């Protein structure tokens, strides 16, 4: 029939009080059906708007502190904005004692110690449980007010005992980063300690800040580009604080990396922004070649490397292999000349090179002349091998009129003359099934990057498309069917 029932489930725990709006989308090959959904709750178990506001407030507090530590804002601006935000959050959630203590810290740092002391005295009088991380935070604030070494050592010992009782408290660990003598005298030890927490699953922005702060102050602490280092560097990249010195250290470590990493690539993009030097570009190109990054998105790096005349093994090959096969333009002259004498390219990449040379033959006739014999031999070899694609079709049409077609080659060319290309922009389409009136069984061809090739000896055929789920479509999916060659030009010679 014309009706389809689609059941769906709404998670009440993720709803706020009142009306909650959403959408259901049914994605078809050529259209998307969208239905508006409204669900209402009384708010008994829903996430309240107040809770969301507090969550946003905590995130804002963290970002303010990060901006202050990274010198994006001055002390007074950080303290005043934090106090204002904390006053608002205390009014919303008065039972949370941490807000008052955080306010006290902002006041202490801003040299308002008397106001901070009043807040801390109120907390101390009302605190009934002195074995919690919050009490440890209070003790830490005491060390900020009274800096006498023996007093600080005494409170540090108390915090250490609390940490033994609360070993999973990231708050207490963060506090000890500033109080433990072993961390004070050894930045590498401190850096490694934070690594254990972050690699253990802790995602506290305060720990990421402290880790980055260490390598910011001493880039040589960055001795490798492992998962921990990449997490911290990505955090720094998103904060917009990657420095030239860190970019240089990343460059020094890059030759040791042998595995392809999307995160590292994004960091390298940011590193080049702060250090757009030839050495950095060379290191990036070498890394991309070493990890076989030949997709079109990386082509700009190889192109830039050639423009800056970087001497790097495999750079010219990488340039061609990453060239967008759908675009035909001028290939740099040095690449054209290089591959005239030395070529380890696959036949598909050679075809890209030759098509670009053919396209530029009026502007660079001398290059075309030097390559003509090579292209003729290449065309003959590929016809004999039965290869055909868009670029090869251009080369065949260019070279065949030059007298290379003999009886033996004509026999190999005959089936290629009737090749069609079918293109479909819908990435859900996986196969095309071609039914010919003259044939009992259909052809079945697979799409690669939205393109497939099939043989059509007569105009009497029909095309059915099949998606990744096995669904078939006759006319509801848009596609383009185009002959690659002109068989009428050569069919008499092939018969």
Model features per residue range: what roles?
Residues 1-417, 421-462, 467-473, 479-483, ...:
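Feature for long, exposed domains in two main contexts
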């Amino acid at each position: 029939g014309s009706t389809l029932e689609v059941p769906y489930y709404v998670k009440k725990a993720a709803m706020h009080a009142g009306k909650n709006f959403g959408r259901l989308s049914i994605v078809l090959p050529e259209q998307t059906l969208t239905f508006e959904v409204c669900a209402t709750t009384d708010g008994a178990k829903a996430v309240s708007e107040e809770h969301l506001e507090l969550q946003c407030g905590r995130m804002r507090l963290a970002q303010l502190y990060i901006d202050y530590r990274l010198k994006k804002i001055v002390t007074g601006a950080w303290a005043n904005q934090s106090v204002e935000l904390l006053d608002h959050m205390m009014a919303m959630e008065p039972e949370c004692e941490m807000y008052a203590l955080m306010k006290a810290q902002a006041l202490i740092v801003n040299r308002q110690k008397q106001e901070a002391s009043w807040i801390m005295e109120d907390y101390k009088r009302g605190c009934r449980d002195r074995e919690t991380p919050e009490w440890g935070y209070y003790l830490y604030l005491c060390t900020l007010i009274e800096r006498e070494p023996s007093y600080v050592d005494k409170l540090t010992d108390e915090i250490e005992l609390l940490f033994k009782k609360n070993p999973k408290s990231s708050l207490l660990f963060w506090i000890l980063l500033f109080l433990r003598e072993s961390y004070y005298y050894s930045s590498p030890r401190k850096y490694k300690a934070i690594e254990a927490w972050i690699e253990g699953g802790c995602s506290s922005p305060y720990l990421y800040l402290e880790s980055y702060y260490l390598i910011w102050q001493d880039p040589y602490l960055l001795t490798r580009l492992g998962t921990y280092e990449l997490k911290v560097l990505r955090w720094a990249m998103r904060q917009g604080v990657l420095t030239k010195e860190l970019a240089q250290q990343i460059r020094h470590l890059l030759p040791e990396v042998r595995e392809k990493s999307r995160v590292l690539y994004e960091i390298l993009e940011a590193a080049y922004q702060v250090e757009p030097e030839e050495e950095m570009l060379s290191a990036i190109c070498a890394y991309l070649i070493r990890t076989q990054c030949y997709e079109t998105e990386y082509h700009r790096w190889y192109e830039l490397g050639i423009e800056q005349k970087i001497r790097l093994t495999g750079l010219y090959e990488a340039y061609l292999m990453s060239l967008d096969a759908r675009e035909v333009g001028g290939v740099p002259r040095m690449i054209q000349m290089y591959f005239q004498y030395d070529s380890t390219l696959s036949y598909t990449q050679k075809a890209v090179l030759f098509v670009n040379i053919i396209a530029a033959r009026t502007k660079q006739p001398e290059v075309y002349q030097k390559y003509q014999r090579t292209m003729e031999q290449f065309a003959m070899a590929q016809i004999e091998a039965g290869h055909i694609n868009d670029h090869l079709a251009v080369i065949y049409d260019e070279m065949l009129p030059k007298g290379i077609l003999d009886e033996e080659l004509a026999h190999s060319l005959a089936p290629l003359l009737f090749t069609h290309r079918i293109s479909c922009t819908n990435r859900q389409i996986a196969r095309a099934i071609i039914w010919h009136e003259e044939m009992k069984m259909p052809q079945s061809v697979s799409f690669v990057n939205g393109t497939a090739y099939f043989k059509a000896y007569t105009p009497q055929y029909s095309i059915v498309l099949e998606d990744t789920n096995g669904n078939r479509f006759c006319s509801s999916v848009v596609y383009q069917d185009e002959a690659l060659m002109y068989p009428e030009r050569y069919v008499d010679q092939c018969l």
